[in-house]
Amino acid sequence: MKINAKNYFKINKTADVTPTNNIVRLATKVQIGMLESQDTEKEVTELDAMKNGLELQDDMADFVQRVMGYTDKQMATINDTVSIEQFGEGVGYLIMRLNGISDADIKLSEQKQRKAMADAKSSK
């Protein structure tokens, strides 16, 4: 499948991605890390939370580089110019694409999320 994540990572490169076993495993590892970082019931010290967050960021960067085929220099540019929120959205986009979701469906989903967030802010 062809994937271009310019909207998230600011690099105009279309990658021809095959969801290999290693890529799917890395995507799953990232998803698990993201879910664990949101688990508010799990007792974690602040230090462990910071360590886990740093490990998750490294895993996410490895995943993006592996899927998109970015060079180390391109990854350095991404890390210096893209916010952590936008980077996380880009990782989510790549995972959805690897799961077979179309660009059109992803765009629709993102629009619904933004509207829900805007509605939540305006109702406060």
Task: For each feature predicted by the language model, list its residue ranges.
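Short N-terminal mixed-charge amphipathic segments
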Residues: 1-54
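C-terminal charged interaction modules
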Residues: 72-124
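An amphipathic alpha-helix signature
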Residues: 57-61
